Amino acid sequence: MCNLYAQIASQDRLRHVLDAVVEDDDEVIEDLTGNLPAQPGIFPDYPAPIVRRTPSGVQLMRARWGMPSPPQYLRTARDPGVTNIRNTASPHWRRWLGPANRCLVPLTAFAEPCGTGRGNQWFALADDRPAFFAGIETRGWRSLRKVRDGETMDDLFAFLTTAPNAEVAAVHPKAMPVILTTPADWQTWMGADWAEARHL
């Protein structure tokens, strides 16, 4: 399960890549991130950049990593969030699988645990192509993430996982994140019906 990744591409580069996400010249690209620093280590429950759809185009903004947990798995009022989503057939996740709740999560590398006491193995593309996790997001969700903070209202995200490729399977045979590397795949993820998008 991927609970650590990096996003060190420059803010300017991310803005440039967004041109390939929009589908027509009338769409607006809005950057709400302010001064977006490189993030060499992104951990669960911390803010990270995502790209999401709006009625007028796309937004680059920050959201908190961890979608709402299925209620049956919560033992207390505290919800630590779910970072990786594999069972898309679950009714809990189906409500967020439509285009209105899909997002792209920029990354430059991700880590999988090597086993107890053995650290992490990092994975990255061999070239310098921009890459995104296939993510889902929800806006304005009220939950208790940290007891000391009390209930908060946050924009949340997580990303989908799939069967691992050969490189990742050697370290983590269960799953790996769904990674999208082409403008066509980005547009399909952001706009196609689930019947088509689920095959990415």
Label each region the model flagged.
Residues M1-L200:
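Short linear sequence motif anchored by a di-proline
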